[in-house]
Structure formats: structure tokens, C-alpha cells
């Protein structure tokens, strides 16, 4: 059976370390770090994600600023809220929970966030810094993947690595981070011809396709490392539908590949907790810069 890349355990260890650093600073009279999460509308999945982030903030000792706006809020109303948070001296990180309701331009709103408070690493300036391998907030999911690989002592340098998916949230920044770690990276997507021809060569395969159980045994190389970024709520039994209940799954058919690959992330409990952990790391890193602190977080940053 493949080694489990346990993101839940590692995320817990990161939270404890952040909590320790924060507690030491609070004893010296420094204000706590603050993270503001803007949620627009009542998307059920977004509610769960925001709740998880708020709980993680409490565990780490980060002050959470919740901001819930109505689904029919205008671009200007959301923009004004971001501008207020930009000037709030108690807020070190700002996250705009995606997806937004139809009709709102997420890209334009992300540009309104102060790049120094960009907790999700999605501001154009910070994506440019990633491209140039300069210091700045990093996209949380790929940063979490890099931390998970490092913690499990998985060698990246020189490895044939394939990333499935080219989104600005995961695929593109993931490829850049792997390249910076000296992997040989191929980025594939929905228009790629002969997907299996690429994935079968991957010593490290990162799957961020957004399609439930897309990848199976026929796609993977023996003894490879598989990182499953996807998480989906699907019927336990397609024939029974709602009556049969639901289950969570990823983009990979794990039961098929578990005895064939060397390591794999579980779903849930793999990449998801690491995404939240890196959100906290970005926030605390911004906090130390705003408060002119010297924390030893370098090994947590990709």
C-alpha cells in the first residue's frame, strides 16, 4: 500500500508552531495577527471552507475578521470593503473567497487587495513575483503541496513531474514552484492529446483537473508519487442517487492506484488542510513584516 502523505497531521504541526511563535510575541506586547475573509453570497461549500479557516485561525491564535456580503452586492460595494480592510492596521491578510456570484469579476477584485495583505497569493503582483522567483505571498494550495512533499522527504530535483490542470489557483503556480525546485515539469490540460502518454512518465503527478475520479491505474507510473488536489461530493451509488447518500472523492481513483504507486495524498485529509495551513503561514509572514518581527518561518515558505 502507498505511503499516505498526511496533510492533516502536517497542517496540525504547522498550526502548533505558528501558535507558539504568536504566543511568544503576544507576551512581548505585540498585537495578534489578523486575517479577513470576504464571503459574497451563500454558497454552501464556501460557507464550509470559511468556517474551516476561521477554526484554524482560532487554533493558531490569529484574529479572524469575517465579512459576509449579500449575493447581489455590486462590484463597487465589494471593492469598498476591500479598501477598508487594506487600511485596517489590525488586518495582515485578506482573502476573497472564491467562487464569486455570476457577474462579478474576481480578477479585478483581487487586484484591489493590497499585495502585502494578499493572503491567497493571487494578486497579479505576487504571481509575477512567483514567476521571477522573488519573495512574496505564495498561492496556498501549491505552496501546501510543496510543504507536504518536503516534509515527507520526497526528492523533486530532476524528477519528471506532470501537473494536470492549468488554473491560476493551482496548476500554473504549481508548475512554477516545481520548476523553481528544479523539477522537469510538463503542464497538461483538457486539450492535451494522449494524456496517458504524459502521465505514465511522471515520477511525481499532481492532479488538479477538477473532475471526480478522472485518473486511474492506466494513467500512473509504478512507484510514482501522486498528489490529488481535487475534492468532490458524489453519490455513493449512481443508481440510487440521493437515497444512497454521498461520499467525498478526489480526481484520482485511489483504490485502483494505492498498491501501485509509492505515495499518495488522501481525500479528504491531504491537500485541503495544507491549503488552510499555508493561508495561515502567509498571514503570519505578513504580520511579522508589518510589525517588524523576526520569526523563523523560512522553512515553511516554498
Curated annotation (Swiss-Prot):
PROSITE patterns: THF_DHG_CYH_2. One of its GO terms (molecular function) is methenyltetrahydrofolate cyclohydrolase activity. It comes from the Bacteria. Keywords: Amino-acid biosynthesis, Histidine biosynthesis, Hydrolase, Methionine biosynthesis, Multifunctional enzyme, NADP, One-carbon metabolism, Oxidoreductase, Purine biosynthesis. It catalyses: (6R)-5,10-methylene-5,6,7,8-tetrahydrofolate + NADP(+) = (6R)-5,10-methenyltetrahydrofolate + NADPH; (6R)-5,10-methenyltetrahydrofolate + H2O = (6R)-10-formyltetrahydrofolate + H(+). GO terms for cellular component: cytosol. Its EC number is 1.5.1.5, 3.5.4.9. Signal peptide: none annotated. It holds the Pfam family THF_DHG_CYH. Pathway: One-carbon metabolism; tetrahydrofolate interconversion. Transmembrane segments: none annotated. Gene3D superfamilies: Leucine Dehydrogenase, chain A, domain 1 (3.40.50.10860), NAD(P)-binding Rossmann-like Domain (3.40.50.720). GO terms for biological process: L-histidine biosynthetic process; methionine biosynthetic process; purine nucleotide biosynthetic process; tetrahydrofolate interconversion. Belongs to the tetrahydrofolate dehydrogenase/cyclohydrolase family. Catalyzes the oxidation of 5,10-methylenetetrahydrofolate to 5,10-methenyltetrahydrofolate and then the hydrolysis of 5,10-methenyltetrahydrofolate to 10-formyltetrahydrofolate. PANTHER family: C-1-TETRAHYDROFOLATE SYNTHASE, CYTOPLASMIC (PTHR48099:SF5), C-1-TETRAHYDROFOLATE SYNTHASE, CYTOPLASMIC-RELATED (PTHR48099). Homodimer. This is Bifunctional protein FolD.
Amino acid at each position: 500500500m502507498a505511503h499516505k502523505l498526511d496533510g492533516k497531521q502536517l497542517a496540525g504541526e504547522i498550526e502548533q508552531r505558528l501558535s507558539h511563535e504568536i504566543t511568544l510575541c503576544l507576551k512581548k506586547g505585540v498585537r495578534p495577527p489578523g486575517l479577513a475573509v470576504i464571503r459574497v453570497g451563500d454558497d454552501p461549500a464556501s460557507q464550509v471552507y470559511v468556517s474551516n479557516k476561521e477554526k484554524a485561525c482560532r487554533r493558531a491564535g490569529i484574529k479572524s475578521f469575517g465579512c459576509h456580503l449579500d449575493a447581489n452586492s455590486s462590484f463597487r460595494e465589494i471593492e469598498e470593503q476591500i479598501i477598508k480592510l487594506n487600511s485596517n492596521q489590525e488586518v495582515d491578510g485578506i482573502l476573497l473567497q472564491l467562487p464569486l456570484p455570476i457577474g462579478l469579476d474576481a480578477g479585478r477584485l483581487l487586484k484591489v487587495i493590497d499585495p502585502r495583505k494578499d493572503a491567497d497569493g493571487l494578486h497579479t503582483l505576487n504571481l509575477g513575483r512567483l514567476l521571477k522567483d522573488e519573495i512574496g505571498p505564495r498561492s496556498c494550495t501549491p505552496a501546501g503541496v510543496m510543504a507536504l512533499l518536503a516534509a515527507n522527504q520526497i526528492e523533486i530535483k530532476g524528477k519528471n513531474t506532470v501537473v494536470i490542470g492549468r488554473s491560476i489557483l493551482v496548476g500554473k503556480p504549481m508548475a512554477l514552484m516545481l520548476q523553481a525546485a528544479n523539477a522537469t515539469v510538463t503542464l497538461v490540460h483538457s486539450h492535451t492529446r494522449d494524456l496517458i502518454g504524459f502521465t505514465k512518465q511522471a515520477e511525481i503527478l499532481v492532479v488538479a483537473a477538477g473532475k471526480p475520479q478522472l485518473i486511474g491505474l492506466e494513467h500512473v507510473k509504478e512507484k510514482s508519487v501522486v498528489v490529488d488536489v481535487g475534492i468532490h461530493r458524489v453519490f455513493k451509488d449512481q443508481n440510487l442517487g440521493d437515497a444512497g447518500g454521498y461520499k467525498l472523492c478526489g480526481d484520482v481513483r485511489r483504490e485502483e492506484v494505492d498498491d501501485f504507486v509509492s505515495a499518495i495524498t488522501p481525500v479528504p485529509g491531504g491537500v485541503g488542510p495544507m491549503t488552510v495551513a499555508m493561508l495561515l503561514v502567509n498571514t503570519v509572514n505578513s504580520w511579522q513584516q508589518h510589525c517588524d518581527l523576526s520569526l523563523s518561518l523560512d522553512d515553511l515558505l516554498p
